[in-house]
Amino acid sequence: MTLRRASGCRQLTLTIGLALTLGLLQWPIGDVRGQDGASPAQVLQELLTRYGDNASISVPQLRSLLVRLNGGQSEDHDSKTQPTRTNASKCLAADTLAVYGMSEQSRIDERGLQQICPTMIQQLDSQACKTQPNQESESSPRPTEAEVWGYGLLCVTVISLCSLVGASVVPFMRKTFYKRLLLYFIALAIGTLYSNALFQLIPEAFGFDPMEDYYVPKSAVVFGGFYLFFFTEKILKMILKPKDTGGHGHGHSHFPAERYANSNGDLEDGVMEKLQNGEAGGAALPRAEADGRGVGEDDKMLSTGQTVQDTQSSGGGGTGGCYWLKGRAYSDIGTLAWMITLSDGLHNFIDGLAIGASFTASVFQGISTSVAILCEEFPHELGDFVILLNAGMSIQQALFFNFLSACCCYLGMGFGILAGNNFSPNWIFALAGGMFLYIALADMFPEMNEVSREEEEAGGSGFLLTFALQNAGLLTGFAIMLVLTIYSGQIQLG
């Protein structure tokens, strides 16, 4: 009886204190001062300074404060009042935050803290933020500055090194397995980019938490609809192929058969037109062998660095600059090469922006975004390397400018971290999600179809192998992002 009476007195004291706090916070800021000389604005500022940072408090920080306040009164309660795990998961839930126009990534200032104060009292009274004994808070703390910059620099460095892989695969570019390997990596990039946008970036932009809002199954169904139509289209194309051999190809054919009978000059113009339309990539090189070019011309274009450099030096002479960058004069290099370099620099800057903002939210989010970008950059950089060679650069020049554009990712990462620390990163997640969807569906998906077009037209075992590689890449990328999303709460680094 004494225990219950003491518990009731403590609860009454807490209620009175919270009521007084509510009255103080609801008073117009700056109009009056309290008995101790501190105005309501100063009280709010002290709370934000003590429990938040940068004159604001994040939702996880506010939730931790409520858990701390609610946990302090639970030791003397009997077992009947112990909250369940479900109550703990509803502390400042997404629908509650939405009433105030907030999300999981929002930063709450003085005015916002004053407005949300009634809900804070309701959460404390209902013990929605009370944890079970020996149970840690559900919300994981934000990464430290060292973790954000350390993991960010590491991931961006690994991604940037992909730009140097192009030179190592030059001797194998005319091999059959190179084309099939490239096809798998393109499909893998589509799967990771599309799934990362569905599972993480777009939900993060809306403030959803995969552990609380249970959106993952619905996102998986969205991918299932995409994959179902892809699978059905390929099967129908294989079944109905005999009907298409008479010249009645379906309306999505991008390259009529007459183009492949043109001269080498017309073919080169077609490739350049395709590159300028944004459908460039690893498909440009494997098509060279199928389009009827002579072996000698292919060997000259895809031989070792010395062959390319010698050929260019004999035609245009050295640049007169750095010896390591010796090759054709910059004024003689095709305009397409500079367009590709500049567009790649902008592309990599946005990639870095997404990586930096993701790491400010959580280490898991940053790693997931980096994995998706890495899978996309690998085949993308290989294709860019070939484009720069075809435009007239030497291997040394192509490596240098490809790596230079890749380094723009560092600049984007820095801006992303600064924006994520001082502003809500939800807008960056929304921008990155749209970009990932476009790259996957409008850029790399047509590229994958173009790489596999020759095998599909031939039919037989070649078509089945190509179809298997496409499915393996798509499903592998989907599985990687699905596993990372489901087990995000168990991923702990550092």
Swiss-Prot record:
Signal sequence range: 1-34
Gene Ontology MF annotations: cadmium ion transmembrane transporter activity; iron ion transmembrane transporter activity; manganese ion transmembrane transporter activity; monoatomic anion:monoatomic cation symporter activity; monoatomic cation:bicarbonate symporter activity; zinc ion transmembrane transporter activity
Topological category with respect to the lipid bilayer: Multi-pass membrane protein
Biological process, per Gene Ontology: cellular response to glucose stimulus; cellular response to insulin stimulus; import across plasma membrane; inorganic cation transmembrane transport; intracellular monoatomic cation homeostasis; intracellular zinc ion homeostasis; iron import into cell; iron ion transmembrane transport
Main location: membrane
Domain of life of the native organism: Eukaryota
Residue window of motif HHHGHXHX-motif: 248-255
InterPro entries, A to Z: ZIP, ZIP_Transporter
Motif XEXPHE-motif per UniProt: ranges: 376-381
Keywords carried by this UniProt record: Cell membrane, Endosome, Ion transport, Lysosome, Membrane, Signal, Transmembrane, Transmembrane helix, Transport, Zinc, Zinc transport
Catalysed reactions, semicolon-separated: Zn(2+)(out) + 2 hydrogencarbonate(out) = Zn(2+)(in) + 2 hydrogencarbonate(in); Mn(2+)(out) + 2 hydrogencarbonate(out) = Mn(2+)(in) + 2 hydrogencarbonate(in); Fe(2+)(out) + 2 hydrogencarbonate(out) = Fe(2+)(in) + 2 hydrogencarbonate(in); Cd(2+)(out) + 2 hydrogencarbonate(out) = Cd(2+)(in) + 2 hydrogencarbonate(in)
Observed phenotype of the null mutant: Embryos with CRISPR-induced slc39a14 null mutations display altered manganese homeostasis. This is associated with manganese deposition in the brain and altered locomotor activity. Mutants survived into adulthood without any obvious morphological or developmental defects.
TM region positions: 153-173, 182-202, 220-240, 398-418, 427-447, 463-483
UniProt topological domain (Extracellular) ranges: 35-152, 203-219, 419-426, 484-494
Compartment(s): Cell membrane; Apical cell membrane; Basolateral cell membrane; Early endosome membrane
Cellular component GO terms held in the UniProt record: apical plasma membrane; basolateral plasma membrane; early endosome membrane; late endosome membrane; lysosomal membrane; plasma membrane
Homology family: Belongs to the ZIP transporter (TC 2.A.5) family.
Subunit architecture: Homotrimer.
Function description: Broad-scope metal ion transporter with a preference for zinc uptake. Also mediates cellular uptake of nontransferrin-bound iron. Electroneutral transporter of the plasma membrane mediating the cellular uptake of the divalent metal cations zinc, manganese and iron that are important for tissue homeostasis, metabolism, development and immunity. Functions as an energy-dependent symporter, transporting through the membranes an electroneutral complex composed of a divalent metal cation and two bicarbonate anions. Beside these endogenous cellular substrates, can also import cadmium a non-essential metal which is cytotoxic and carcinogenic.
Protein name per the record: Metal cation symporter ZIP14
Species in which this protein is naturally found: Danio rerio
